[in-house]
Amino acid sequence: MASDENIGADGEQKPSRPFLRKGQGTARFRMPRNNKTSAGAPPTSELSSASSPSINVPRFSLSNALPNSARTVDSGISNEDETRPPTTASLPMDQPSLSSSPENRLNPAPSVAEEHGHSGQHAEEEEDNDTDEVSAMPSFVPDEPSTLVNSDHELSDDALKYKNAAAEFKAFERRMDSMRSASTITTSLATPSSCAPSNSSEPPTRSTPIMNDLGVGPNNHNWPSSMQELSGISLETPQARPLGSNRINQLVRSEAQTGISLLQHHERPTVTAPLRRNDMMNSSRQNPQNGNVQDENRPEHVYDQPIHVPGSSLDRQKLEIEIRRHRNLNIQLRDTIAHLDYAEESVHTTKRQLEEKISEVNNFKKELIEEFKKCKKGVEEEFEKKFEKIKEDYDELYEKLKRDQRDLERDQKILKKGTGERNKEFTETIATLRDKLRASETKNAQYRQDIRVRDEKLKKKDEEIEKLQKDGNRLKSTLQTLEKRVKQLRTEKERDDKEKEMFAKVAMNRKTSNPVPPVLNQSVPISITSNGPSRHPSSSSLTTFRKPSTSNRERGVSWADEPNEQSLEAVPQEFLMMPVKEMPGKFGKCTIYRDSLGETSKVTDTIANGLLFEYSNGDLRWVNRQNAVNIYISAVDKTVRIDLPTYNISIIHTFQRQVEVLRPGNNITLISIKRREVRTDLIYQNGMYKTEIFNRDGRYVTKDFSNQEVSRKYNPGTHTYRDNQCRYVLVTDYNDFELVEPEFRLRWYQGDPTGLNNQYILKIIGRPECSEKTLRLEVNLSTCEGTLETAEMIGDKRRKTTLFQWKK
């Protein structure tokens, strides 16, 4: 029956669904609801193809083999759609290759367009208001025209031939409507489909017109000779099978709906309509030889009559019924196989879906179990923590209650006792508390002592760490200094080599080799012996390249030459430093000198009748005009050297190492940079050697070759005298001592409590007879920065004037 699923909410007709609904059989096609037509409506056979579509059955060939199962046939259902069963519209069950008839093998049946119509009379008698019509359209209607359905101009000649024949048979059907009253004879074997009682659930159908020659009798048909041959009969796809209680009626209706297969593959005997008695008499009078000739007024097609046909036996009728039964059974078997395949696939799909759902449920169950375990574990841990806390609170409260109870009991006992006993107990309690207090104070004192010891250890460790850091910095600075010194020495060596080569060339060109007169030496600036490099190469070169008087005498020179004749080309003018320009400097007005090698020197006149030389490599030298004081400061290794040529005394300060005081007679005083000791080595005129050492821990040690080492403790303010008490060492403190001598005074003291700014001050006493001022040189031992000043007394006041300063 047709459903209302194609009718929209607004009453409009929706497009029909091209697919079967879930659960419908393969042979149950969609049957549209067919309303009762009006009296003036055209018959069904005359409707257009849009309202009553027809199909073109394709011609089958030997290549179309029977499938193993109905599911393997292309039913037009998408593989992705698992909810729709396959149809049998394209099943090649009726292939002519499987038929036993030789005519079917030679002449395969062409495509036939089949349409079914209704009779208005039977529709009023046998149908209800809602009747279903079986259409030849396949259950699957593709979106685009299929290759199996062709237009009229694309049909073959055979198809057009059979199409015209079908139109003629439709005309015969209309003429046969008047003869239905004659078909009143019925038997228990079969009933014509046109005369069978109608069922409200199934539409009335008509027999399919026979396509064979009407003149061929039943004797000309090739019937199967055995059941094996009968089982091989090819079948065509059936239309919707009606359901009925009578098996014979069901077989007849099924046969009526499989007319295409009967037209295409085999002939069936022509069953004539029953004749009236007068007609039978008239037919018997005719010539029996013309029994096969049809009358023109006789219709070309009549309905099957399940009665005893004259001229045929009962076995032939039974055989025909058996053939139809087997055919219908084969059709039912095919549909059953299709339904079973679809059911199996549905079960498999449902099973897979259920397995997936079960797997998801199991996974969800596992997750819930894990989450439950975690929650349970967390709750247990939280419960244990709360229980422990409650237990601790309970124990604490219980102890407090016990103490309170003891106190109450003690108070009750005290109240029961007398005043004397009470005072006695109070005295004992006070004594006990005092003992506890003393013990606590003792422990606190011990703790303070331990803390003090620990602090001292930490302080020592900090000092050691600081010392190591300073040593590391000093080593780094020394390394840098040595690198710079090596670079400077290489440069000086190259320059000296060039100078030697130049002066050697000059010496080879001399006309005489007499000694240079003293006047030439006086024109050269004074050269002071020091550890620093000489800035006057001319003087060193003159000393180096002086030769004996007979070394460079020319061959052509006679003995009559004057011995005092000499050449002034010994020192060329280009090797002497000549003044270039004058400009103001940071210490006063200065003059810049330059030699032929490109070396420059800056000379500045300072107070105290001195000259300050600033060289291009950063070195500084200060010399007074009397040549009594010569101070040289090296920029590379930060060495400070003070020479007193008049007294033959030198004071050398090596950065981060020590201070040396060199006196005549190889008397040396060494002061370590960390002030660990002050060591003085003395050599007397009689050859006696003596060493005096002032340690930082307050010990005074004397050593010599003849006597044992003597060590004693000295007190601050101690004086040690020598050289008739004109020279001595004044020790004011461990970090403050002074070397007092007639020519100078050198004081070493600690600049701040940390000991990071230790300084020494050298005071050079000026000679009054030479109008010299006292010089004061202050040097920082940590940074090697210093200042040179003049100090003089004006009345009761001391006045200082800065000559120059130097920094890193």
From Swiss-Prot:
One of its GO terms (biological process) is maintenance of protein location. Residues 161-181, 314-503 form a coiled coil. Keywords: Cell cycle, Coiled coil, Cytoplasm, Cytoskeleton, Developmental protein. It comes from the Eukaryota. Residues 1-151, 187-206, 271-298, 511-564 are annotated as: Disordered. Residues 124-133 have a biased composition (Acidic residues). The keyword Metal-binding does not apply. Residues 113-123 have a biased composition (Basic and acidic residues). Residues 61-78, 85-104, 280-294, 511-529, 542-551 have a biased composition (Polar residues). Residues 42-54, 530-541 have a biased composition (Low complexity). The keyword Lipid biosynthesis does not apply. Required for centrosome duplication. Plays a central role in determining centrosome size. Interacts with hyls-1; leading to hyls-1 localization into newly forming centrioles. This is Spindle assembly abnormal protein 4. The lineage of its organism: Eukaryota, Metazoa, Ecdysozoa, Nematoda, Chromadorea. The gene is sas-4.
